[in-house]
Amino acid sequence: MSESNGTDVLPLTAQVPLAFLMSLLAFAITIGNAVVILAFVADRNLRHRSNYFFLNLAISDFFVGVISIPLYIPHTLFNWNFGSGICMFWLITDYLLCTASVYSIVLISYDRYQSVSNAVRYRAQHTGILKIVAQMVAVWILAFLVNGPMILASDSWKNSTNTEECEPGFVTEWYILAITAFLEFLLPVSLVVYFSVQIYWSLWKRGSLSRCPSHAGFIATSSRGTGHSRRTGLACRTSLPGLKEPAASLHSESPRGKSSLLVSLRTHMSGSIIAFKVGSFCRSESPVLHQREHVELLRGRKLARSLAVLLSAFAICWAPYCLFTIVLSTYRRGERPKSIWYSIAFWLQWFNSLINPFLYPLCHRRFQKAFWKILCVTKQPAPSQTQSVSS
């Protein structure tokens, strides 16, 4: 993005500390995201669908630290004139990287939504690498289409005598900035909020069902007047009210000693016999199924929390800049007021590229193990018992 209000020449005592801090930020962004990329390359266990999207986010943030900030430091602090060619390259690259980072967050949130809300179908799908790469490439194409053509077309709008500031030609067109703010911020935030709400709603429903008593079995119905019977499968999640001490008989079904309980409930209204047959297999498997469901709920809650943190960081880092750009677009070029708050809002966008790798990938136990593997550390952290939950 471009800091369109310009910067006065600062004294050397201020330039050196600022240059050091800006360079430190660029270095931290580069190293943090490079670790994520290298961990993904070094550990094959990380190469599943969701981590590919985190890789896409790390790539865009990595080049923010390699290209966007290093080129901007001499321009803003030492009044280095880019020239039209470098200025155009920097504008397109910076807008592309920042927007691709935003759209990668949307793609990550959609993948999280699918893995929690449609867990069975999500795990049953075997998404090929080509489809995953196509989704990653689509993020970059959409990110370029948001600002790239407009930057190229608006270059002729700029005042040819004003070559000191490297900014797109539409910075004074409020309606264009409103559209780009909608595509870069409001729409992505709305989508991530929607996916987050759906995830929490799905987890709440699953948590409510898991607290209900569950009895699986078969219902066999027979008519008193005929010898025919019908057997149907049923999974009943609630107890039947009003049933008192039904007659029961225990019999063996197989040489292995599997037993089943046959409960005959005679109804006096329709003259039918309803039998609930609960097999020992269901009784033996229910603790395992309950434990698996509990693990899935814990995993879903962790994913929901990580997505909420990712959304909060994105909103905090991007909302001030979008608001400032729309407000400042109402001023004519060269008459826009200079504010330290605008500069802070401007740098917050790039700061988001620093915190993104620490919000999920570098806190993920598998990424940490891959990081130790990169450093060739023989003593790796002991795997946690909840590794299956965090993965």
Curated annotation (Swiss-Prot):
Task: List keywords of the entry alphabetically.
Answer: Cell membrane, Disulfide bond, G-protein coupled receptor, Glycoprotein, Membrane, Receptor, Transducer, Transmembrane, Transmembrane helix
Carbohydrate attachment residues: 5, 159
Q: Which residues lie on this side of the membrane: Cytoplasmic?
A: 41-52, 109-131, 196-306, 365-391
GO MF: histamine receptor activity; neurotransmitter receptor activity
* GO annotation terms (biological process): adenylate cyclase-inhibiting G protein-coupled acetylcholine receptor signaling pathway; chemical synaptic transmission; G protein-coupled receptor signaling pathway, coupled to cyclic nucleotide second messenger; inflammatory response; positive regulation of cytosolic calcium ion concentration; regulation of MAPK cascade
Question: Disulfide pairs?
Answer: 87-166
Query: What is a single cellular component term in the Gene Ontology annotation?
Result: membrane
**Segments passing through the bilayer:** 20-40, 53-73, 88-108, 132-152, 175-195, 307-327, 344-364
List residues in topological domain: Extracellular: 1-19, 74-87, 153-174, 328-343
Q: Where in the cell is it found?
A: Cell membrane
Which residues fall in a coiled-coil region? none
Q: How does it sit in the membrane?
A: Multi-pass membrane protein
The stretch of residues making up the signal peptide is: none
Q: How does it assemble?
A: Interacts with TSPAN4.
Protein task: The H4 subclass of histamine receptors could mediate the histamine signals in peripheral tissues. Displays a significant level of constitutive activity (spontaneous activity in the absence of agonist).
Q: Which family does it belong to?
A: Belongs to the G-protein coupled receptor 1 family.
The protein's name: Histamine H4 receptor
Record organism: Rattus norvegicus
**Name of the gene this protein is made from:** Hrh4
